[in-house]
Amino acid sequence: MHRINALKHLALLGALKKPVKISSSEFTRYTSTGSKTAARILKQLEEEGSIDRLIIPEGQMISITEKGHKWLESEFSDYKHIFCGDEDKVELYGNVITGLGEGQYYIAQDGYGSQFEEKLGFKPYPGTLNVRLTSHSADILKRKSQKNIIPISGFTDGQRTFGGCNCYFVEVEGVRGAVVTPERSHYPHDLLEIISPVHLRKTLELNDGDEVKIMIEDRSACE
C-alpha cells in the first residue's frame, strides 16, 4: 500500500514526464511516514524497477519507469471499475482496411470540424481509420443499444449540403477516438470509421489486415 501511494505522489509531482528532484525527508510529507520508511519505500520501488533513481548532493532525481507506469494504469483501472462499473463496456474486434479516401475531405469541412472539437473534446486528425468488424463483433454492435450517441448536425456551405452523423466514444488499442456513422441508412453495419486526435495508423503502426481491439466507452458514468 505504501509503495503504490508513493508512486502515485511521484506521478503527481511530474515523475511520469521527467525526473523530479526530491529528498527522502521531503518525501515524508507525501507518504505520512518517517524519513527512514520513506527512504526504504523509494529503495524498494527502485529495486523492483518501478522507478529510476540518481543520487545527487541535494537529494535524488527520480523518474517513473514503464513498469511503474503500468502499475499506476492498473490501479486506475481498479478505481474506474469501483466507481464506474464495467457493465457497459463492449469489446469489438475487426481488421484494418483501406477506405475510399473521403474521410480527410469531410473532416476538413469547418461545419464538421468545429462540432467535433466542441462535442468530442478534441480536434481530429484529418483522416479516418477504417475497420471491418468480425461477424461476431458486428452482431454484438447491432444488438447494443447506444446510450451516449453524440449527434453532429448537417449543414450547407453555400454550394452543397452535408448530411448529419452520429458519434460515440471508443478506444482503439488504448488510444482514444470516436466512431463516426453517417445518418444515411444504407451504411454497412460492420464498417467503422474512427476519428482520433492522432494519426491512428501511424501511432499504432497498423497495416491493412491487422486486427485491432475496439472498446466502446460509456463516458457518462465517469464524467
Swiss-Prot record:
Its EC number is 2.7.1.161. Pathway: Cofactor biosynthesis; FMN biosynthesis; FMN from riboflavin (CTP route): step 1/1. InterPro entries: RibK_CTP-dep (IPR039063), Riboflavin_kinase_archaeal (IPR023470), Riboflavin_kinase_CTP-dep (IPR023602), Riboflavin_kinase_dom_sf (IPR023465), WH-like_DNA-bd_sf (IPR036388), WH_DNA-bd_sf (IPR036390). FMN binds at S185, E193. GO terms for molecular function: magnesium ion binding; nucleotide binding; riboflavin kinase activity. GO terms for biological process: FMN biosynthetic process; riboflavin biosynthetic process. Its cofactor is Mg(2+). Binds 1 Mg(2+) ion per subunit. Residues 90-223 are annotated as: Riboflavin kinase. The keyword Magnesium applies. The keyword Aminoacyl-tRNA synthetase does not apply. Signal peptide: none annotated. CDP binds at G99, L100, G101, E102, G103, Q104, V198, H199, L200, R201. It comes from the Archaea. Residues 1-89 are annotated as: Unknown. Pfam families: CTP-dep_RFKase. PANTHER family: RIBOFLAVIN KINASE. Catalyzes the CTP-dependent phosphorylation of riboflavin (vitamin B2) to form flavin mononucleotide (FMN). This is Riboflavin kinase. It comes from Methanococcoides burtonii (strain DSM 6242 / NBRC 107633 / OCM 468 / ACE-M). The gene is ribK.
